[in-house]
Swiss-Prot record:
Assigned protein family: Belongs to the gamma-glutamyl phosphate reductase family.
GO BP term, example: L-proline biosynthetic process
EC code: 1.2.1.41
Record has Zinc-finger as a keyword: no
SUPFAM superfamilies linked to this entry: ALDH-like
Gene Ontology CC: cytoplasm
UniProt superkingdom: Bacteria
Reaction it catalyzes: L-glutamate 5-semialdehyde + phosphate + NADP(+) = L-glutamyl 5-phosphate + NADPH + H(+)
Stated role: Catalyzes the NADPH-dependent reduction of L-glutamate 5-phosphate into L-glutamate 5-semialdehyde and phosphate. The product spontaneously undergoes cyclization to form 1-pyrroline-5-carboxylate.
This protein's encoding gene: proA
Name of the protein this chain belongs to: Gamma-glutamyl phosphate reductase
InterPro entries: Ald_DH/histidinol_DH, Ald_DH_C, Ald_DH_N, Aldehyde_DH_dom, G-glutamylP_reductase_CS, Glu-5-SA_DH, GPR_dom
Iron-sulfur as UniProt keyword: no
Keywords attached to this entry: Amino-acid biosynthesis, Cytoplasm, NADP, Oxidoreductase, Proline biosynthesis
Length: 444
């Protein structure tokens, strides 16, 4: 039973994690991989049971009026569970970087100096909504030889508990300490306040959720923080570009799924191709119910090539109400900063690549931004000058994902520049220590 005293409870979690981290740091690669494969098998064997627990969370979320994108993030479908299992297996098949020595060089004194990759120790993960994060965090923690304390959102408590039980079962059956992965079993937010102020136990905190959560954690934490901020991702359609390819990619980047942080929220279009590109993508978005918040230039092109029947929705609608269909509205300044997580996209016509880069660097959350172009020099300029964790050429921002990057899983997508940036996989949960080898040398 959880103690009423949240300080005692958090300290108990921290002490157990610290003790387990010492065992995990020296765990053999084969043992860690066995635990990951065991976990993959347990996930597949328990799909029905997991969905029963998940259904309780979803029912409670719907009854409480949780927004539809947040409810969508809660769902543990068979496909989501299978992806988690595959992520565990992919991690098990990857090389173990723990103990790897890099950059070994002989110095004039005779000593050899290099760096060894080692686990961070204990990380705390504070996240909202997505229960699959429990598996992603746990599997990466196991592979990287760390211990972790996970605190999911109250809206996913039953799903997270069920998943954490499977993780601990896999650890125990593989000969590793169950305490290497601990889930906070209470929804009391006071525990979060304790976790982020325990440098004696916790080496780093990784918050993954809304802007309010991350700002509070960053402000109050007494341990280092790796931030997973919002994803105001941009796709820029350049001149020249393959229009058909650009329509296909811009469609996927926005409508493949609305709730992930790697969905495109703003579409920038070079003026020279706007008259050809915008009507085509407009018809696609209109058919899928995507609201388009446009700057005056884009709006004028759409009005000349009307892809939708505009309606008045109280957001500076451009015309009187006709019928409930996808809408064109005049974008406001705040729209350029917005992560919608919904069938809404901001659209702006720009002079060219220079203006696109300037716009992205001003309004982007520095998560993921893409250029669609046939100009190699423009592509290289975009890659150099856009200040984001992931920059892409001729592909969908939806690929900004640890699994798609071959990391096996991700703990989050860091928009920081310090320590880890972009999808945080195994190496992001390690640090480097110096290794010095000698043969009796002494300093003069």
């Amino acid at each position: 039973m959880i103690p009423l005293n949240t300080t005692d409870y958090a300290n108990a979690l921290g002490l157990k994690a610290k003790q387990a981290s010492a065992l995990m740091a020296r765990a053999p690669t084969a043992t860690k991989n066995a635990a990951l494969r065991k976990l993959a098998g347990l996930l597949r064997a328990n799909v029905n049971a997991l969905q029963i627990d998940n259904a309780r969370d979803i029912e409670r979320a719907v009854q409480s009026g949780l927004a539809a994108p947040m409810v969508d993030r809660l769902k543990l479908s068979p496909q989501v569970i299978e992806t988690c299992a595959q992520g565990c297996e992919q991690l098990a098949g990857m090389a173990d970087v723990i103990g790897e020595i890099i950059g070994m060089k002989q110095q004039p004194s005779g000593i050899r100096v290099g760096q060894m990759r080692v686990p961070i120790g204990v990380f705390g993960m504070i996240f909202e909504s997505r229960p699959n994060v429990t598996i992603e965090a746990a599997s990466l923690s196991i592979k990287s030889g760390n211990a972790c304390i996970l605190r999911g959102g109250s809206e996913a408590i039953e799903s997270n508990k069920a998943l954490a039980r499977l993780v601990q079962q896999a650890l125990t059956e593989s000969g590793l300490p169950a305490e290497a992965v601990q889930l906070v079993q209470t929804t009391d937010r006071a525990v979060v306040g304790q976790l982020i102020t325990m440098p004696q136990y916790v080496d780093v905190i990784i918050p993954r959720g809304g802007k309010g959560l991350i700002e509070r954690i960053s402000r109050d934490a007494k341990v280092p923080v790796i931030k997973h901020l919002d994803g105001n991702c941009h796709t820029y359609v350049d001149d020249p570009c393959d229009i058909a390819m650009a329509v296909k990619v811009a469609d996927n980047a926005k409508t493949n799924k609305y709730s992930p942080c790697n969905a495109t929220e703003s579409l920038l279009v070079a003026r020279a191709v706007a008259a050809e590109f915008l009507p085509s993508i407009g018809r696609v978005y209109a058919a899928k119910g995507v609201e388009m918040r446009c700057d005056p230039q884009a709006l004028a092109i759409f009005k000349e090539n009307q892809p939708v029947a505009p309606v008045n929705i109280g957001h500076d609608a451009i015309d009187s109400a006709v019928e409930l269909k996808p809408v064109l509205v005049l974008a406001q300044e705040s729209d350029w900063f917005e992560e919608y997580l919904a069938p809404i996209i901001s659209i702006k016509v720009v002079a060219g690549v220079d203006e696109a880069i300037a716009h992205i660097n001003r309004y982007s959350s520095h998560h993921t931004d893409a250029i669609l172009t046939r100009d190699h020099m423009h592509a290289q300029q975009f890659l150099r000058e856009v200040d984001s964790a992931s920059v892409m050429v001729n592909t969908s921002t939806r690929f900004a994902d640890g699994f798609e990057y071959g990391l096996g899983a991700e703990i989050g997508i860091s928009t920081d520049k310090f320590h880890a940036r972009g999808p945080v996989g195994i190496e992001g949960l390690t640090s480097l220590k110096y290794v010095v080898l000698g043969d009796g040398e002494i300093r003069a």
